[in-house]
UniProtKB/Swiss-Prot annotation:
Source organism superkingdom: Eukaryota
Tissue-by-tissue expression: Widely expressed, including dopaminergic neurons in the substantia nigra.
Organism listed in the record: Mus musculus
Gene Ontology cellular component annotations, sorted alphabetically: autophagosome; axon; early endosome; endoplasmic reticulum; late endosome; membrane; recycling endosome; synaptic vesicle
Transmembrane segments: 46-66, 79-99
Name this protein carries in UniProt: Transmembrane protein 230
Topology of the protein relative to the lipid bilayer: Multi-pass membrane protein
Organismal lineage: Eukaryota, Metazoa, Chordata, Craniata, Vertebrata
Task performed by this protein: Involved in trafficking and recycling of synaptic vesicles.
Length: 120
């Protein structure tokens, strides 16, 4: 049988709980240095992506209406270049708007850093 510990100040036996002194928590760091700053939102790049998206959508609609003959009877010689330009303008706008949307919703793997900025 193990002898029980006694409290030296009072002479009473102590419980079996062992207490230890806490280490000093002052290690020179403050919590603010570990907090993330809010992300810098590239408003100009998002505005440009929106303009590209809208112009591309408009050109795709016009090109498809030209191709179907609804607007004029010019045929494919006018419609195909309009469709190609519309697709080339639409794709980067859609891509960057999608990144901006997912970054604003906080999806993992998407951030505003993925959108090119104008460095102003």
């Amino acid at each position: 049988m193990m002898p029980s510990r006694t409290n030296l100040a009072t002479g009473l036996p102590s419980s079996k709980v062992k207490y230890s002194r806490l280490a000093s928590t002052d290690d020179g760091y403050i919590d603010l240095q570990f907090k993330k700053s809010p992300p810098k939102i590239p408003y100009k790049a998002i505005a440009l992506a929106t303009v590209l998206f809208l112009i591309g959508t408009f050109l795709i609609i016009i090109g498809s209406l030209l191709l179907s003959g609804y607007i004029s009877k010019g045929g494919a010689d006018r419609a195909v270049p309009v469709l190609i330009i519309g697709i080339l303008v639409f794709l980067p706008g859609f891509y960057h708007l999608r990144i901006a949307y997912y970054a604003s919703k906080g999806y993992r793997g998407y951030s505003y850093d993925d959108i090119p900025d104008f460095d102003d």
